[in-house]
Swiss-Prot record:
PROSITE patterns: AAA
Protein name (database record): Probable mitochondrial chaperone BCS1-A
Family the entry assigns: Belongs to the AAA ATPase family. BCS1 subfamily.
Name of the coding gene: bcs1la
Species this protein is from: Dictyostelium discoideum
UniProt GO BP: chaperone-mediated protein complex assembly; mitochondrial respiratory chain complex III assembly; protein insertion into mitochondrial inner membrane from matrix
């Protein structure tokens, strides 16, 4: 009987202890929640805060501003990021706030920076979501607005009169490639007939007629294919057009080992505003429909590869980006499947051929800064045949005689055509 009493006491004590622990832990949680609520209310009455999401353009502006701000460099924890410049120039290392809390002085006042990296991934971009919180005392609230305006102005001024180049990064996002390039003059790209004016007028018409497309239910996007022998200025023309129309260039590398159907869809539908999408040497990625059907069959179990159908869906799927200007280039149009360059995907096809005599004469006068119809230029071009040499071959020859146009004329017949394919 005593044994049963002892057991009953033990059970009662156990239950009482459990209830006590439960009540204590519950009380602690309630106390913590109430404390956090009170703290948040106090903070909301003392501090002013703005959150900037990594999906917004202002996130990039803010990071650039911070990298140029000396007061952030006294922080104990920074990230070193490499900025790649053009070929032949050394890359540049910039310092930006790492994930965590930082404090800077702006116009003599304290500003708190909190960079947060989410556990969640943006599956389309293949990168974690990020945000930056900027806070200060409520009495200094206007400083944050001034800071953001200053960050925007600094970033935009960096790009004024320049062409920004974006490339598809390994995480599926667009990344700036090096420093913005100086705008290339459209007059420096010498093409036959009126190809430049025809292309420029078509793009301008597209840009200014958005409402016309929308009113008729026509997808508001435009595609161009530049084709022809290599070395005749297809890429140079696109760079010059971007400069003329104040557009940036987003280069899509289909040969990247990291790119797949999901990423190409994300890239083509999330290009920075006021930019040209450029897919160079499309024939090298997709030579023909037959090749890619075989490739798709072989890779049917591989979810990490770009497929032909995946590219087509990205080009004109339901989610295709409105206002998109797309350029493709190829040296061999005959290798492209007709479905890839049909109307609706490619609206205008322009052949960029080897140099004519007229182009050679124009290049000569441009190279030596001579008047139009100069007799030296005419003599130079008379020694060449139409469509025999590429513009890059002629330019390469002239570079040997940068200070002697007469010598270039004497040696012009030494230029030997060769196949760049």
């Amino acid at each position: 009987m005593n044994h049963l009493k002892d057991q009953s006491k033990s059970i009662v004590l156990g239950i009482s202890s459990g209830i006590g622990i439960f009540l204590i832990s519950g009380g602690i949680n309630i106390f913590k929640n109430v404390g956090q609520y009170i703290l948040n209310r106090i903070n909301s009455n003392i501090y002013y805060r703005i959150d900037v999401d990594s999906k917004d353009k202002s996130f990039e502006w803010l990071l650039y501003w911070l990298s140029e701000n000396d007061s952030i460099k006294v922080s104990n924890h920074l990230n070193a990021e490499t900025v790649y410049n053009l070929v032949g120039k050394n890359p540049k290392v910039i310092l930006v706030p790492s994930v965590g809390k930082h404090r800077i002085v702006y116009k003599g006042k304290w500003i708190w920076i909190d960079r947060v990296r989410d556990q969640q991934f943006d599956m389309g971009a293949g990168a974690p979501f990020e945000s930056i919180s900027i806070s200060t005392y409520k009495s200094n609230a206007q400083l944050i607005n001034q800071l953001l305006q200053e960050a925007m102005t600094l970033s935009l001024n960096r790009d004024i009169g320049k062409t920004v180049i974006y490339i598809n990064g390994g995480n599926g996002n667009w990344e700036r490639f090096g420093n913005p390039r100086s705008i290339r003059s459209l007059s420096s790209v010498i093409l036959a007939d009126d190809l430049k004016s025809k292309l420029i007028e078509d793009i301008k018409s597209f840009i200014t007629n958005e409402s016309w497309y929308r009113n008729r239910g026509i997808p508001y996007r435009r595609g161009y294919l530049l084709y022809g022998e290599p070395g005749n200025g297809k890429s140079s023309l696109i760079n010059a057009i971007a400069g003329e129309l104040n557009l940036d260039i987003c280069i899509v590398s289909l040969s990247s080992k990291d790119i797949d159907d999901k990423q190409i869809n994300h890239l083509l539908n999330n290009a920075p505003p006021k930019s040209i999408l450029l897919i160079e040497d499309i024939d090298a990625a997709f030579k023909s429909h037959r090749d890619n059907v075989d490739s798709n069959n072989n890779n049917s179990n591989n979810n990490n590869s770009l497929t032909y159908s995946g590219l087509l869906n990205a080009l004109d799927g339901v989610a295709s980006q409105e206002g998109r200007i797309l350029f493709m280039t190829t040296n061999k149009i005959e290798l492209l499947d007709s479905a890839l360059i049909r109307e609706g995907r490619i609206d205008l096809k322009i052949k960029v051929s080897n140099a004519t005599k007229s182009q050679a004469a124009q290049l000569f006068t441009h190279f030596y800064n001579l008047p139009t119809d100069n007799q030296l230029a005419i003599r130079f071009s008379e020694n060449l045949h139409d469509h025999q040499l590429s513009m890059s071959q002629i330019q390469g020859f002239l570079l040997k005689y940068i200070n002697s146009p007469e010598k270039a004329i004497e040696e012009v017949q030494s230029i030997t055509p060769f196949n760049l394919n």
